[in-house]
């Protein structure tokens, strides 16, 4: 710990103690006063929270603190997510003595060996990291109301979740049936993002299997995502060196890779008959089930046996990889299938040639493939003559009947429609099948086992595929504020593809499914409306309500207003006054004003949050805003346990101090961007905060009780502008922009002010107090310290947002002085040897204002001589937008008084004595004709050498 970090930690500990003693962040409903209810995703205590969590929690805290300044009653609570397998899996691995995991926990989290030994108990592990993470959040300075803290295995929470699930079931949104899910073979259970290493969501995709059969009756199921291209197949590809098997599958003897047989075994019955190398099947001919053509099997080392079935169909006219591979073999057989405006018959060939791709190893092949596939899918139409290739092996009238079907539903149809038709037709005709796969493989369970897709029977699902439910979810996304705005498209896309999702497991911590024993509600399903639970748990405890009293009637009354307090009291034994108080608490705080999380949770938690709110609550209780921030890197690299570069939040606080850490997480990137946390930046920000502390001390020590001048008014005006910019940035959740204004730009203004005055005035202390309030959401501890030094009353955390009286004339005065100094420096006579500078001021400010409209007559009417009016109009045109705006908004401005006020500053800046005269002063000498040349806003300048 450096001396600087120790300085900030000591200040933070002092103020955190006072906050806690004063219960300043434990709000109560205040009728008639607007509230602001914000939450951030509660953490899993399977490890200590790190700076990635810290960023999300900081953004929420900045908003919470800002809205306190705006007069809102603010609630920012926190809980801990014990549900699911993450805690259980880590405990099992530690209990088994896994050296890698144990070393990770000791090295990254600094867990002592004696504590590691106890972590084979999952609840001990959870409590350890729960307590440590809570302490880290407190030391980080989060303004959390800890009186509402809970865990997801608390009995009160479990009764709440069971009520939610009964509601979903009664609405027909929970179903039981057959569906593909991500699956851990070791634990024999479905998995989601929170069950996997690095919280990676298993993305389940569907291959269409097309059955090509040889003369011996062996079937080669080619796996494809583009079944509409099967009429254009010229050959199949098989990896000659890969391991394949002959197996019984779907009533056929099939040839597939050994890996595919393993993956398929979780979806259907697969019986391996024998093993073989791929080369055994190279050179055979197989029949296309759609066209009837016989096509050869070629060898190809690019075929990955872990993808699909290890059998790939080749469509060189529409697949760049296939085209290049066949070209390398000296074969060019192209069958056109799809018409796309702007392309010829063979898009794959065209794109390959345009990109100059010479070999199968050219990285540009991937780009070429994306272009062809995307363009054909979005703009492509199947050729009308494709029907001529259908069923050539069939006898009449079967051939004509089949071609008629393809003419109606396939030929001339958009690619997306043709794809849907043929995939369905192949399965119904028993000429193909379906295989599910993890498309973003490899994905690993936290136990280390690779995830596969299993088709489950009798599994409980939340049916996110329900069309009406999807439509209601879309309405909420459309209405609510989502930051960043471009994330709305991501939410809409997620709503579109979401389908049934397994909602229960047979192992792990959590809430039992209320109607089916042996099932535990999984972690991404019990964490969708818990924000409502924060509003009531405090009073549930205060009134001593037992878990068994938290019945369906209780929750219906509290959250939905159903039934009367008297009726519910009779059924539950909960006192009427308790029921009413809890209902009032919920009514005051809900709806949620802002939900804060990482962008990686958009495809799951955040979208489930939307779905479940619209299903459970009436429209007026739907959430109002989601903030989805980017990831946190460390020194340019993704943080991961394997790299040993995860930085726990408590360690980061110890290294830098809480406020420098907060400043760095705020300043390094805007909310929607990924943030690269760098040690050098954190240390630079610590120096900046120390400089702010020193500057305010200097202001306090040197402030004089004298009348304020133009320079003091300029300070007030500039800080007022910064306050306006910061307020707007906070309101728009532009946290970086706000931090730049209050930590760097405001400091620069004060530095400039102190450079212009010999002694600051008491007005400067008023500006400093306003500044401290504005910086408090970012760096609250140093703000409290400075607030106390500046004589502020109470906590700065609860001070109202400052209002400074900003005079545009003060800003114009400073810009005027800057322009004058620049003009002097541009005069050739200025420099070493200059003895004095004589400045002549034309005080007819009304002429300059009149010149803004560019009309000579208007300027003359204001009193200017005609020859002066034209010069003045030309001058005003050269002024920048800022000066012209200030000129328009300023009613009175005295150039003479301004220069007198700034005289000492101008002399110090130029290093030369100055004399100031008004052109109206008859006793003033006209040196070099500069007196009569002076214009409003453009003084005459004479330099004597």
Curated annotation (Swiss-Prot):
Binding positions for ATP per the UniProt entry: 641
Cellular component annotations (GO), alphabetically ordered: cytoplasm
E.C. designation(s): 6.1.1.4
Segments carrying motif 'HIGH' region: 43-53
Gene3D superfamilies: Class I aminoacyl-tRNA synthetases (RS), HUPs, Isoleucyl-tRNA Synthetase, Domain 1, leucyl-tRNA synthetase, Valyl/Leucyl/Isoleucyl-tRNA synthetase, editing domain
UniProt keywords, alphabetically: Aminoacyl-tRNA synthetase, ATP-binding, Cytoplasm, Ligase, Nucleotide-binding, Protein biosynthesis
A GO biological-process term: leucyl-tRNA aminoacylation
Cysteine disulfide partners in this protein: none
GO molecular function: aminoacyl-tRNA deacylase activity; ATP binding; leucine-tRNA ligase activity
Chain span(s) of sequence motif 'KMSKS' region: 638-642
Subcellular localization(s) per the UniProt record: Cytoplasm
InterPro entries: aa-tRNA-synth_I_CS, aa-tRNA-synth_Ia, Leu-tRNA-lgase_arc, Leu-tRNA-synth_Ia_arc/euk, M/V/L/I-tRNA-synth_anticd-bd, Rossmann-like_a/b/a_fold, tRNAsynth_Ia_anticodon-bd, Val/Leu/Ile-tRNA-synth_edit
Catalytically driven reaction(s): tRNA(Leu) + L-leucine + ATP = L-leucyl-tRNA(Leu) + AMP + diphosphate
Domain of life: Archaea
Signal peptide limits: none
PANTHER family named in the record: LEUCINE--TRNA LIGASE, CYTOPLASMIC (PTHR45794:SF1), LEUCYL-TRNA SYNTHETASE (PTHR45794)
Sequence similarity: Belongs to the class-I aminoacyl-tRNA synthetase family.
Entry-linked HAMAP family: Leu_tRNA_synth_A
The protein's name in its UniProt record: Leucine--tRNA ligase
Organism the protein comes from: Pyrobaculum islandicum (strain DSM 4184 / JCM 9189 / GEO3)
């Amino acid at each position: 710990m450096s001396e600087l970090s120790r300085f900030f930690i000591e200040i933070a500990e002092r103020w955190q103690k006072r906050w806690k003693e004063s219960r300043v962040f434990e709000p109560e409903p205040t009728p008639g006063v607007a509230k602001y209810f914000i939450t951030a995703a509660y953490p899993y205590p399977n490890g200590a929270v790190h700076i990635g969590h810290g960023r999300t929690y900081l953004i929420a805290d900045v908003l919470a603190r800002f809205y306190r300044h705006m007069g809102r009653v603010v609630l920012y609570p926190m809980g801990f997510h014990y549900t699911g397998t993450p805690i259980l899996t880590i405990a099992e691995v530690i209990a088994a003595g896994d050296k890698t995991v144990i070393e990770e926990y000791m090295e990254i989290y600094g867990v002592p060996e004696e504590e590691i030994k106890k972590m084979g108990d999952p609840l001990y592990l959870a409590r350890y990291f729960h307590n440590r993470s809570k302490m880290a959040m407190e030391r980080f300075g989060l303004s959390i109301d800890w009186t509402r803290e809970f865990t997801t295995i608390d009995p009160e929470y479990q009764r709440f979740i069971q009520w939610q699930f009964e509601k979903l079931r009664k609405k027909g949104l929970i179903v039981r049936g057959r569906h593909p899910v991500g699956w851990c073979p070791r634990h024999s259970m479905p998995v989601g993002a929170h069950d996997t290493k690095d919280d990676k969501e298993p993305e389940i995709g569907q291959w269409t299997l097309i059955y090509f059969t040889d003369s011996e009756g062996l079937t080669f199921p080619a796996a494809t995502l583009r079944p509409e291209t099967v009429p254009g197949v010229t050959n199949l590809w098989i990896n000659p060196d890969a391991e394949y098997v002959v197996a019984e599958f779907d009533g056929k003897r099939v040839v597939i890779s050994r890996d595919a047989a393993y993956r398929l075994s979780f979806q259907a019955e697969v019986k391996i008959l024998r093993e073989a190398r791929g080369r055994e099947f190279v050179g055979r001919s197989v029949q296309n089930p759609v066209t009837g053509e016989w096509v050869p099997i070629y060898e190809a080392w690019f075929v990955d046996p872990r993808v699909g079935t290890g059998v790939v169909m080749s469509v060189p006219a529409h697949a760049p990889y296939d085209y290049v591979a066949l070209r390398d073999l000296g074969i060019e057989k192209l069958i056109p299938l799809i018409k796309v405006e702007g392309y010829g018959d063979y898009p794959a060939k065209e794109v390959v040639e345009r990109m100059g791709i010479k070999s199968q190893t050219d990285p540009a092949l991937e780009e070429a493939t994306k272009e062809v596939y995307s363009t054909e899918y979005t703009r492509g139409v199947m050729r009308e003559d494709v029907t001529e290739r259908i069923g050539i092996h069939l006898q009449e009238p079967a051939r004509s009947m089949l071609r008629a079907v393809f003419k109606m539903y396939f030929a001339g149809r958009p690619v997306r429609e043709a794809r849907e038709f043929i995939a369905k037709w192949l399965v119904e005709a028993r000429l193909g099948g379906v295989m599910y796969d993890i498309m973003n493989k490899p994905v690993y369970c936290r136990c280390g086992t690779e995830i596969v897709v299993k088709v489950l029977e009798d599994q409980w699902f939340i049916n996110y595929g329900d069309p009406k439910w999807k439509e209601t979810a879309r309405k909420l996304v459309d209405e609510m504020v989502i930051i960043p705005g471009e994330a709305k498209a991501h939410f809409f896309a997620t709503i579109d593809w979401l389908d049934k999702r397994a909602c229960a497991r047979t192992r792990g911590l959590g809430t039992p499914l209320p109607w089916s024993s042996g099932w535990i509600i999984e972690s991404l399903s019990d964490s969708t409306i818990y924000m409502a639970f924060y509003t009531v748990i405090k009073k549930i405890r205060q009134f001593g309500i037992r878990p068994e009293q938290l019945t369906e009637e209780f929750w219906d009354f509290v959250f939905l207003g159903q039934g009367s307090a008297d009726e519910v009291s009779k059924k539950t034994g909960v006192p009427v006054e308790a029921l009413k108080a809890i209902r009032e608490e919920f009514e005051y705080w809900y709806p949620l004003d802002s939900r804060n999380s990482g962008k990686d949770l958009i495809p799951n938690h955040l979208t489930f949050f939307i779905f479940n709110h619209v299903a459970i609550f009436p429209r007026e209780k739907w959430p109002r805003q989601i903030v989805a921030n980017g990831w946190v890197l460390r020194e340019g690299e993704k943080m991961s346990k394997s790299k040993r570069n995860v930085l726990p939040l408590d360690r980061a606080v110890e290294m830098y101090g809480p406020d420098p850490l907060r400043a760095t997480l705020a300043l390094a990137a805007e909310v929607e961007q990924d943030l690269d946390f760098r040690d050098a930046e954190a240390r630079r920000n610590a120096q900046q905060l120390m400089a702010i502390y020193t500057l305010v001390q200097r202001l306090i020590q040197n402030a004089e009780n004298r009348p304020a001048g133009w320079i003091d008014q300029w300070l007030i005006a500039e800080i007022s502008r910064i306050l306006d910019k910061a307020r707007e940035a906070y309101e728009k959740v532009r946290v970086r922009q706000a931090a730049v204004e209050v930590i760097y730009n405001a400091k620069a203004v004060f530095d400039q002010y102190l450079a212009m005055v010999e002694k600051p005035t008491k007005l400067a202390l008023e500006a400093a107090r306003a500044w401290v309030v504005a910086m408090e959401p970012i760096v609250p501890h140093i703000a409290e310290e400075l607030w106390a030094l500046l004589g502020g009353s109470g906590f700065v955390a609860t001070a109202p947002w400052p209002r400074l009286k900003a005079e545009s004339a003060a800003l114009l005065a400073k810009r005027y002085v800057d322009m004058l100094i620049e003009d002097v420096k541009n005069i050739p006579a200025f420099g070493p040897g200059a003895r004095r500078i004589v400045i002549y001021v034309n005080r007819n400010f009304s002429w300059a204002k009149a010149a803004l409209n560019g009309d000579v007559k208007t300027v003359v009417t204001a009193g200017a001589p005609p020859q002066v009016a034209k010069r003045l109009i030309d001058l005003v045109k050269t002024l920048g937008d800022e000066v012209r705006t200030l000129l328009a908004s300023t009613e009175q401005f005295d150039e003479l008084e301004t220069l007198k006020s700034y005289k000492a500053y101008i002399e110090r800046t130029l290093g030369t004595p100055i004399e100031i005269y008004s052109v109206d002063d008859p006793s003033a000498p006209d040196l070099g004709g500069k007196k009569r040349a002076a214009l409003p806003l453009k003084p005459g300048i004479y330099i004597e050498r």
